[in-house]
Amino acid sequence: MKKVRAAIVGYGNIGRYVLEALQAAPDFEIAGVVRRAGAENKPAELNDYAVVKDIKELQGVDVAILCTPTRSVEKYAKEILAMGINTVDSFDIHTGIVDLRRELGACAKEHGAVSIISAGWDPGSDSIVRTMLEAIAPKGITYTNFGPGMSMGHTVAVKAIDGVKAALSMTIPTGTGIHRRMVYIELKDGYKFEEVAAAIKSDAYFVNDETHVKQVPSVDALLDMGHGVNLTRKGVSGKTQNQLFEFNMRINNPALTAQVLVCVARASMKQQPGCYTMVEVPVIDLLPGDREEWIGHLV
């Protein structure tokens, strides 16, 4: 079996877990890791791998797994797709997904590559669950309640705001798909808390939610990467009312995001050039090995 050569682009929380997921996958080999510092002061777990500053320094890359902040995804994806290399990412600004799909779709088709976007657990695997529930109960209401837990995307967004030394953004469900954002920050010297808090609340990640910003002496003392979701739908199948569905999970956020990214990296090798979200990709393409064996096992 020819293995898929994957490059990890970005080596923060998600990148570290992508490394573990690739090491555990029977059909992948790690082409290398791209990080801003290159091989300088590289962590011990990367000693066996090529560590570079630019993906152009790696050989024979089939797919790049983007573990960068969401707001950097489009830039990196376009550069890599233009090289004819597939990309996958966990872009998580829901309102920007349609536009990103259009932008990367044109680039991917031009260069004969595949991009699968917004492939974390939400958006991502939860999107598949929502799609299935809507199909089997076409009329009704779905509520997605996140947490309580640490939001990776929101935390990264806070860290990027001027004056923030360290940050943790917690998502607290209040019910019926409405959430409260609890943001804990350490402040850099010379900045006013009120001004930094206002900048956080006006960011696109927070502007539509009830958001509370708290200054703390140590973010590390609060840190827990656990998260979860409760997803429910109450609707109608045919003409029959009161069909109720519920999906729950409690997870380590970056570990699950990483596993989903590796699954869609595999699936990217089976699609025609273009840009896809997870609801457009056959779920069986997420799995390694023989398709008929999976059909016999799962169906």
Curated annotation (Swiss-Prot):
Induction: Is expressed at a very high level and is reciprocally regulated with dapL and dapF. Substrate binds at residues 92, 122, 146, 152-153, 171, 181, 227, 253. One of its GO terms (molecular function) is diaminopimelate dehydrogenase activity. It catalyses: meso-2,6-diaminopimelate + NADP(+) + H2O = (S)-2-amino-6-oxoheptanedioate + NH4(+) + NADPH + H(+). Pathway: Amino-acid biosynthesis; L-lysine biosynthesis via DAP pathway; DL-2,6-diaminopimelate from (S)-tetrahydrodipicolinate: step 1/1. InterPro entries: Diaminopimelate_DH_Ddh (IPR010190), Gfo/Idh/MocA-like_OxRdtase_N (IPR000683), Meso-DAP_DH_C (IPR032094), NAD(P)-bd_dom_sf (IPR036291). Optimum temperature is 37 degrees Celsius. It is an enzyme of class 1 (oxidoreductase). Homodimer. Probably plays a role in lysine biosynthesis. Can use NAD(+) only very poorly since the activity observed in the presence of NAD(+) is about 14% of that with NADP(+). This is Meso-diaminopimelate D-dehydrogenase. It comes from Bacteroides fragilis (strain ATCC 25285 / DSM 2151 / CCUG 4856 / JCM 11019 / LMG 10263 / NCTC 9343 / Onslow / VPI 2553 / EN-2). The lineage of its organism: Bacteria, Pseudomonadati, Bacteroidota, Bacteroidia, Bacteroidales. The gene is ddh.
